[in-house]
């Protein structure tokens, strides 16, 4: 049996004569899907009484129902029973690593949810393993039963060596080389350092040039209306951070695509309803908007895929036809691939989804092959998922912790001010809270009064002699033990929070023993652990197994009292999002891009 990958379907230029013969009825198709309503993303209508003629993994034509009868026989027929046939979903902005699984494992959940193409920014593994990590994920993607394209990581590290230690450093020359050697590298990934871009930083603009010289589009990530004009003038043409009405207005009129990000209500990515209202209240066209998932853990990916985002868009006021187009054709159009994916026109890949009236996927075809039927993966897909890429040995040895170091700071006995990191739902923006401490030696009482707990970040790439930075979280809610993660965005050093030194040490040791992971510790015991041995970011298990591990982690996370989800906790070191962060170098004041002491 041949492997099921993106390459299973021949390129269009090699099939045009065959497709023309089938479309005109001179040659029979390989199979026909009949009795369907077809969702046209081109006209944004649902067309009744249609059938699709498929050959070579591509759509030859959409015909009136029953047209195949004039051909005689010799082809398979699939009866859609008046269900809706729509093009497979296209996710224009995701990070596979957030799901903590490999590209091949990710494909299972994506196809179950009707997603057949993704545009992945692999800056997480790039921050750990540099080019070698990005290329390993590309090799993984080539073997996956899913169309995966790379938006080349543009901001590795997220800031500078003065503010944090990363494992990777993707220079302009390295980025140019990735574009030149990998056809899958179709765009530049989100340019998160929008302040340096707008200020004319030389390195940032050299990276932009590496993409623009090659005709590749540039993806973005920007906060603040004051930056929009300079950002757009620098060549950035999409962003997924536009939920405020005024900045969305500015971005649309500056020619910047807006990806409306949808996430479960319990995560930092729950912004879709507000984002949709922004577009509808502006009276703006949705033609330059698409929907995306951005980040999903393994558990949420199974339940809240891009199909869920589309349905949420309908709830927020879009028509079903508009919403599905935003989830398919628009993402394809943004990356100039609408001649291949995103619709059911002749010549397009036969990436198809059978929907019920609520836009819930029932069955999925990938390149004309049935991979999900009645909500279950087929033997063909199961076989493809078992042929997983083997990551190099170096990927299993990226957590290089120093000898035991102190994880809590020396607490002053004199009056001081604490530069605390105040957490709040959904967990993206962190507030710089200056907490005045009167002279006292009873710190446990002060911790309870002010809602404080310890936090530390430990350098794990073996580069900075085991840097450890200490901080205090406010309102994180942790009432016992410790929590730790090797997925501390974006440099992915170890972040640990706790109520006491002993449990914090146990948590960090557990991360080290598994070469990465996320864990909860109480009373000296590991209560939940998601091992992530590949680059300290990815599991080597099937997504269903990882999803079960994540469910237990979430249960124990909540039992520990944490007020923001673990994915929000992973963002605490992300030094490009306001207001205050902690990295292995110390506390970072983001607007000023400078370090500040814990106690003043």
UniProtKB/Swiss-Prot annotation:
Its EC number is 3.5.4.2. The keyword Manganese applies. Keywords: Hydrolase, Manganese. The keyword Ribosomal protein does not apply. Coiled coil: none annotated. GO terms for molecular function: adenine deaminase activity. It catalyses: adenine + H2O + H(+) = hypoxanthine + NH4(+). Gene3D superfamilies: Metal-dependent hydrolases, Urease, subunit C, domain 1. GO terms for biological process: adenine catabolic process. InterPro entries: Adenine_deam, Adenine_deam_C, Amidohydro-rel, Metal-dep_hydrolase_composite, Metal_Hydrolase. Pfam families: Adenine_deam_C, Amidohydro_1. Its cofactor is Mn(2+). This is Adenine deaminase. Belongs to the metallo-dependent hydrolases superfamily. Adenine deaminase family. It is an enzyme of class 3 (hydrolase).
């Amino acid at each position: 049996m041949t492997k099921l990958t993106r390459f299973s379907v021949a390129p269009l230029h090699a099939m045009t004569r065959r497709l023309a013969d089938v479309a005109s009825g001179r040659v029979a198709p390989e199979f026909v899907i009949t009795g369907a309503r077809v969702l046209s993303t081109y006209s944004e209508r649902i067309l009744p009484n249609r059938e699709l003629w498929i050959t070579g993994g591509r759509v030859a034509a959409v015909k009136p129902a029953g047209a195949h009868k004039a051909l005689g026989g010799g082809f398979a027929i699939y009866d859609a029973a008046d269900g809706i046939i729509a093009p497979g979903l296209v996710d224009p902005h995701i990070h596979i690593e957030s799901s903590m699984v490999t590209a091949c494992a990710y494909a299972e959940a994506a196809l179950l949810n009707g997603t057949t193409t993704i545009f992945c920014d692999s800056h997480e593994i790039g921050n750990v393993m540099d080019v070698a990590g990005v290329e390993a994920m590309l090799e993984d993607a080539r073997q996956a039963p899913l169309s995966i394209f790379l938006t080349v990581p543009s901001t590795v590290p997220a800031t500078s060596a003065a503010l944090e230690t990363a494992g990777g450093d993707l220079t302009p020359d390295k980025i140019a080389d990735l574009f030149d050697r990998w056809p899958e590298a179709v765009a530049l990934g989100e340019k998160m350092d929008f302040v340096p871009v707008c200020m004319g930083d030389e390195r940032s603009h050299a990276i932009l040039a590496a993409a623009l010289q090659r005709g590749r589009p540039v993806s973005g990530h920007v906060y603040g209306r004051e930056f929009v004009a300079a950002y757009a003038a620098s060549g950035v043409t999409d962003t997924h951070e536009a939920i405020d009405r005024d900045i969305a207005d500015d971005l649309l009129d500056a020619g910047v695509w807006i990806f409306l990000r949808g996430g479960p209500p319990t995560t930092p990515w729950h912004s879709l309803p507000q984002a949709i209202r922004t577009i509808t209240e502006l009276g703006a066209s949705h033609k330059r908007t698409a929907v995306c998932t951005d980040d999903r853990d393994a558990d949420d990916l199974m339940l809240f895929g891009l199909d869920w985002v589309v349905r949420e868009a309908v709830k927020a006021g879009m028509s079903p036809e508009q919403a599905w187009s935003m989830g398919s054709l628009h993402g394809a159009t943004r990356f100039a691939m609408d001649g291949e994916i995103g619709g059911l026109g002749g010549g397009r890949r036969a990436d198809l989804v059978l929907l019920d009236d609520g836009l819930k996927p029932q069955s999925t075809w990938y390149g004309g092959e049935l991979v999900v039927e009645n909500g279950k993966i087929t033997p063909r897909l199961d076989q493809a998922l078992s042929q997983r890429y083997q990551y190099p040995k170096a990927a299993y040895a990226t957590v290089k912790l120093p000898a035991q170091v102190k994880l809590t700071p020396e607490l002053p006995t004199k009056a001081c001010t604490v530069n605390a990191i105040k957490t709040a739902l959904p967990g993206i923006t962190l507030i710089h809270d200056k907490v005045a401490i009167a002279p006292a030696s009873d710190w446990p009482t002060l911790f309870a009064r002010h809602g404080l707990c310890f936090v530390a970040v430990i350098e794990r790439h073996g580069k900075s002699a085991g840097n450890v930075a200490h901080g205090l979280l406010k309102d994180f809610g942790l009432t016992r033990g410790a929590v730790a993660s090797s997925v501390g965005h974006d440099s992915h050093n170890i972040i640990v929070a706790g109520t006491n030194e002993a449990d914090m040490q146990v948590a960090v040791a557990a991360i080290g023993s598994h070469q990465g992971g996320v864990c909860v510790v109480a009373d000296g015991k590991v209560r939940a652990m998601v091992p992530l041995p590949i680059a300290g970011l990815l599991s080597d298990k099937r997504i269903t197994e990882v999803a079960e591990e994540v469910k237990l982690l979430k249960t124990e996370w909540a039992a520990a009292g944490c007020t923001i989800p673990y994915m929000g906790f992973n963002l605490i070191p992300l030094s490009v999002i306001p207001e205050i962060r902690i990295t292995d170098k110390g506390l970072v004041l983001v607007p000023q891009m400078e370090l500040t002491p814990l106690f003043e």
